[in-house]
Each structure stands twice: as structure tokens, then as C-alpha cells.
Amino acid sequence: MKIDILTLFPDMFTGVFGSSILKKAQEKEAVELRVVNFREYTTSKHNSVDDYPYGGGAGMVLTPQPIFDAVEELTKETDRKPRIVLMCPQGERFTQKKAEELAGEEHVIFVCGHYEGYDERIREHLVTDEISIGDYVLTGGELASMVVTDSVVRLLPGVLGNQTSQVEDSFSTGLLEHPHYTRPADFRGMKVPDVLMSGNHKNIDEWRHKESLRRTYTRRPDLLEERELSKQEEKWLEQIKEDR
């Protein structure tokens, strides 16, 4: 997979892309990550990439020319059109399902904005997707693109050492992940649930499933509205409600 990031601040990505899972994914050649400063593509004699908005108003607006030219340069040798993703607070809310969708692409280009916003022609005639990571405002799209890139890359084949871990992560099953415990079994009087040390894998799996359901119900009940519960899950959910 190939991922390109269009940004005015390429140095922001050095530490993130050179560490942890993203570093390992590149070493395994599961993904090629490129960070491109789209200022290098401007034709402005002042080397600018933004201008005042027509009609007046506060702030500066990113001009279309350098972003269009950068995308055209990055895609000139490919037959298949890539997904071009605009990072912005007006976009579709990013979810695990969206991460899985993007992970199936051969080439994704993230466009990171800054200043007041983008010229609308970038939205209308260039990008294929607009993504937001939450209902809050960031200085630019860089941090958001890092979040999405990390979420997508870890889904690529061979990137994670334990594929089971990936499947059991929060949101992958539509539920939040169950609690985890490790040694010691008794820490300052706080004990690990007996079932986890019983060796009975059927009971352990059942406990984890039920606790995932409990955690989802108490912390993110909205997720249950989108999920078709099994009969067993419905039974557990009734017990969970009675326990509260």
C-alpha cells in the first residue's frame, strides 16, 4: 500500500512515522509512507499557498493550484485513481469501518489543511472523501491524518504480530474491548478475577464477551444501537442492566 501526505509541515511526521508500528510496517514493506510539502508545487512568485477569501472575512484560504498540481504529480504514473482524503472537521466521522475500507486501497492521499480552510473547488473537483476524527477543532489536518494512517496501517496483512489481537481490539467486533489483567494475581489487595486463572477457556471467552458488552453498555451505549445482538447477548445485557 502507498500513502502520501500533503502538508505544509512535513517535520511533524518524522517522529510518528519513524516509530512503533508505522516504522515496522515500512521495514516489512507493507506500506510506503511519503510526506510531501505542497508548497513546493506553488507557482506563486511569493511562494504562497493561500490568499484572502472572496467576499471578505477573517483568515486565509488555501489556493487550489498547489494542491491540484501536487496530486497530479503523485498520480501521474498510476493507472488506478487513488482515494484522496481531505482532513477537515466537516467530514464524515472516522470509524473502524472506514479504516478497514481504506486499508483495502492500493493508494491513499491525505490532504492536510491549515489556515481558515480550503478553496471549495478542491472539495468539489479533487477529493474523494472528507474525514473528521471528532467534533473539535485542530490547528491543521496533520494530527488527524496521523491518527487515520496509524489506524489503517495496523490493519494491513503482516503488520501486527498477533492478528487475533487486531480482531479483539475495541470497535473491531462492534463492542469495546474487555478488561485485561497480568501478574501479580493480587496487587495491594486488588485481585484478578478467578475465572481468568481457571484455565477453562470456554468460561474465559464467555467472561470476556460479557465484559465487553458491559463496558460498551456503560461507556458507549450508542454502539449497541448499531449492533444486532445475539440472543445470548440480549440475555447478558438484561443481567447487566439489573446489576447496575
Curated annotation (Swiss-Prot):
SUPFAM superfamilies in UniProt: alpha/beta knot (SSF75217)
Gene Ontology terms, MF aspect: tRNA (guanine(37)-N1)-methyltransferase activity
Reaction(s) the record says it catalyses: guanosine(37) in tRNA + S-adenosyl-L-methionine = N(1)-methylguanosine(37) in tRNA + S-adenosyl-L-homocysteine + H(+)
Main location per the UniProt record: cytoplasm
GO biological process, one term: tRNA N1-guanine methylation
Superkingdom in the source lineage: Bacteria
Pfam hit, one: tRNA_m1G_MT
EC number(s) from the headed UniProt entry: 2.1.1.228
Main function: Specifically methylates guanosine-37 in various tRNAs.
HAMAP family, per database record: TrmD (MF_00605)
Subunit relationships: Homodimer.
PANTHER family assigned: TRNA (GUANINE-N(1)-)-METHYLTRANSFERASE (PTHR46417:SF1)
Record protein name field: tRNA (guanine-N(1)-)-methyltransferase
Gene it is expressed from: trmD
